Amino acid sequence: MGKLTLLQCLSGHRGRVWGAGWHPRDPVLATCGEDKTIRIWADDGTGRWVPKTVLSDGHTRTIRDVAWSPCGRFLASASFDATVAIWDRRSGEFECNATLEGHENEVKSVSWSKSGALLATCSRDKSVWIWEVAQEDEYECAAVLNTHSQDVKKVEWHPNEDVLASASYDNTIQLYREDLADSDWSSFDTLASHDSTVWSIAFDASGSRLASCSDDQTVRIWQEYKPGNEFGVACPDGKTPVWKCVCTLSGFHSRAVYDISWCKKTGLIATACGDDMVRIFREVAGSPANEPTFEMVASKHAHSQDANTVEWSPTVAGLLVTTSDDGDVKLWKFEDDE
């Protein structure tokens, strides 16, 4: 088992806090919420996190998600006002240098590809958009993907390839890639196992596994099987990998599971749930790759209302952030007993 310890509660947002994003290198955190603001927090050098900046002029409605570019210079924010704002902190101060328009309804999620050359967004309008970063302040729409039949909740890029995953109210996950012959983006696999809305998804460090969480109160682990794999899983065209559900975590959550994060440093999975709890799971050592088992190693009543977001720090092992309907942002430290 392990121990989850509260390090600090960051107060400042008014109303629900929807999203949080760690800077890829620096001890900096961005959060966003119902109050239409983005708040930037930083470690003051002593381990205490302090407010640095409030960005309040980019959106006219709730801000649902924030994501830093891989280089750490740009911050993208997705809003219920149907736009995505791109913030540039080159000069040290944040400036909104682009507003991406095109979605017809609330934008729910935003994600940068590993190279930073592509940005994905998704919306209540059932679409996923892929944007090419032409220049630092120019973004061109490369694809509009209308594969889902309902509200799209989350987009997440593969950590090593230009492969995109999206999760939807239609209970499915779609996987997309570009056909290099004609530059068209399309779905190459539909992952359908959940019984209700898929709220969030997260790749592991290798990108060969994907975790998903749902309104059906479960977490599912999906495994990629490439052509000629040792397990004998057939790939229909002999070229395209297929993804299979290899593990279902059920009985741990008592409400909808709203977010999931797979730590790239430790392999631990964290979930944020509608029962106000945060839970940590670890793969059981020695469990087979195509039939893995996971155990819950920590749980904490983290908030007084729904836990909306959980995200592991990309730079500090065991550090994670949670956000909630209760208006708080909390920083936690997980320590393993083993």
Curated annotation (Swiss-Prot):
Work out whether the entry's keyword set contains Heme: no
Summarizing the function annotation, the protein's role is: Essential component of the cytosolic iron-sulfur (Fe/S) protein assembly machinery. Required for the maturation of extramitochondrial Fe/S proteins.
Repeat (WD) positions are: 12-51, 58-97, 102-141, 147-186, 193-232, 234-252, 253-291, 302-338
Has the keyword Flavoprotein been applied to this entry?
A: no
InterPro entries according to UniProt: CIAO1/Cia1 (IPR028608), G-protein_beta_WD-40_rep (IPR020472), WD40/YVTN_repeat-like_dom_sf (IPR015943), WD40_repeat_CS (IPR019775), WD40_repeat_dom_sf (IPR036322), WD40_rpt (IPR001680)
What keyword terms does UniProt attach to this protein?
Repeat, WD repeat
**Which SMART domains does the protein's record reference?**
WD40 (SM00320)
Q: Name one GO cellular component term.
A: cytosolic [4Fe-4S] assembly targeting complex
Q: What is this protein called?
A: Probable cytosolic iron-sulfur protein assembly protein Ciao1
What family does the database annotate? Belongs to the WD repeat CIA1 family.
Which GO BP terms sit in this record?
Answer: iron-sulfur cluster assembly; protein maturation
**Domain of life, per the record?**
Eukaryota
Q: Which Gene3D superfamilies match?
A: YVTN repeat-like/Quinoprotein amine dehydrogenase
